[in-house]
């Protein structure tokens, strides 16, 4: 069976926490650190053989190691997200064929979604967890000029994003060659004109960005664990 790796990104600087939370990845959420939720979900999924965790400093690495799968390779993160991903890709074992890339600041990913993504990537080479946008989105073109975008074609990208190892390594090499700034991995693959499949996520999978997000994530976890259905509007 083809070996699969998971790159768990934990090296973010928590800049938008405005000092309220020193390290959002280690912040307590439903009785355990934010990082532990993603780590345990990937373990339960049974689709990952190799774990790589990017970290921001030695103290954080020690704390992360208490919740990381065994064994895990820890790799120092870079200044930006793309630098951390590139550093982790460079450390992949030679026999890895597929790669999950996941922001640990999204702790609500589900094991069944990982299984579905793993099945799709073996067919498509590139797949991203995503959801459709329901808000009206406008592009601001300056001087009060707005352009309404057709939301039927708009999706919000989430993580995990999953790729064949050869494809994502080629894509990140193209990013480095052109000295581009990207904020997700699918953007790198787009440079190669390679199609990216989307797996629609019907469940909330928000990213922890501000202090207020912690309370929202706690609420979502409580609803999920108690199996109380989400209201439909």
Sequence positions of predicted segments:
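Short, charged/polar "capping" segments at the starts of alpha-helices
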Residues: 58-64
